[in-house]
Swiss-Prot record:
It comes from the Bacteria. It is a peripheral membrane protein. Residues 5-247 form the ABC transporter domain. GO terms for biological process: phosphate ion transmembrane transport. This is Phosphate import ATP-binding protein PstB. ATP binds at G37, P38, S39, G40, C41, G42, K43, S44. Belongs to the ABC transporter superfamily. Phosphate importer (TC 3.A.1.7) family. Disulfide bonds: none annotated. The gene is pstB. Part of the ABC transporter complex PstSACB involved in phosphate import. Responsible for energy coupling to the transport system. InterPro entries: AAA+_ATPase, ABC_transporter-like_ATP-bd, ABC_transporter-like_CS, P-loop_NTPase, PstB-like. The complex is composed of two ATP-binding proteins (PstB), two transmembrane proteins (PstC and PstA) and a solute-binding protein (PstS). It is found in: Cell membrane. One of its GO terms (molecular function) is ATPase-coupled phosphate ion transmembrane transporter activity.
Length: 258
């Protein structure tokens, strides 16, 4: 079930370095929210705070709150691993497990999180591959290595792996940046389908992509070099690209910087 994310007063650190500062926003369920902004503005860091992946980096910590349908993801006693089951992630470069078959790649998270009969696993793997629009391309070679697929197919395999555990939210960190235009189109079409089931947040440097796939867009920027990233503006995507409220947003979208 897709869930709403409410962020309030979020500041993230890596050791003594303040990466982002005082971010507050809401991500609506069953929608696509795009994060845009120049390199180094903190959009990927912020994305990672939404499922506590930033804590994998030594010294990663936050102040503020992230609520998933009123559940505090940073509350006392909350297991980060359980958070990542609810809030899945797809990374910039396709990263199928290289020694695993296509089937085992999709089933990996399921096996980690519980005990399933083979028939149950087969049913979920098929459903997930169909959900990622990959089933018809791989159904006759499920025992072959996932690393043998094309780049676009590998990324869809990673999406199938992420949705197999039925998360509430799906985070995507530049999921098309390493793909060719045809594969990018396939992923964008898939995002449009997945938002019917999941809350989706995507980081992208491609503003045309943000305009195509998202319902809402958030623009991040730095006040100055060496300063933490900040959320400058968030609104309906159509408004952000046609009539932004902040001059810096218009300057970035029009190509004056970034």
């Amino acid at each position: 079930m897709a869930k709403r994310i409410d962020v309030s007063g979020l500041t993230a650190y890596y050791g003594s370095h303040k990466a982002i500062e005082d971010i507050s926003m809401t991500v609506e369920p069953r929608s696509v929210t795009a994060f845009i902004g120049p390199s180094g503005c903190g959009k990927s860091t912020f994305l990672r705070t939404l499922n506590r992946m930033h804590e994998v980096t030594p010294g990663g910590r936050v102040e503020g709150k992230v609520l998933l349908d009123d559940e505090d993801l940073y509350g006392q006693g909350i297991d980060p691993v359980s958070v990542r089951r609810e809030v899945g992630m797809v990374f910039q470069r396709p990263n199928p497990f290289p020694t695993m078959s296509i089937f085992d790649n999709v089933a990996a998270g399921l096996r980690l999180n519980g005990s399933y009969k083979k028939s149950e696993l087969s049913e979920i793997v098929e459903k997930s591959l169909k959900g990622a629009n990959l089933w018809n391309e791989v159904k006759d070679r499920l025992n072959k290595p996932g690393s043998g697929l094309s780049g676009g197919q590998q990324q869809r395999l990673c999406i199938a792996r992420a949705i197999a555990v039925e998360p509430n939210v799906l985070l995507m960190d530049e999921p098309c940046s390493a793909l060719d235009p045809i594969s990018t189109l396939a992923i964008e079409d898939l995002i449009g389908e997945l938002k019917e089931r999941f809350t989706i947040v995507i980081v992208t440097h491609n503003m045309q992509q943000a305009a195509r796939v998202s319902d809402r867009t958030a623009f991040f920027n730095l006040a100055a070099v060496g300063q933490p990233g900040r959320l400058i503006e968030v609104d309906e995507t159509e408004r952000i690209f046609s009539n932004p409220s902040v001059q810096a947003t218009e300057d970035y979208i029009s190509g004056r910087f970034g």
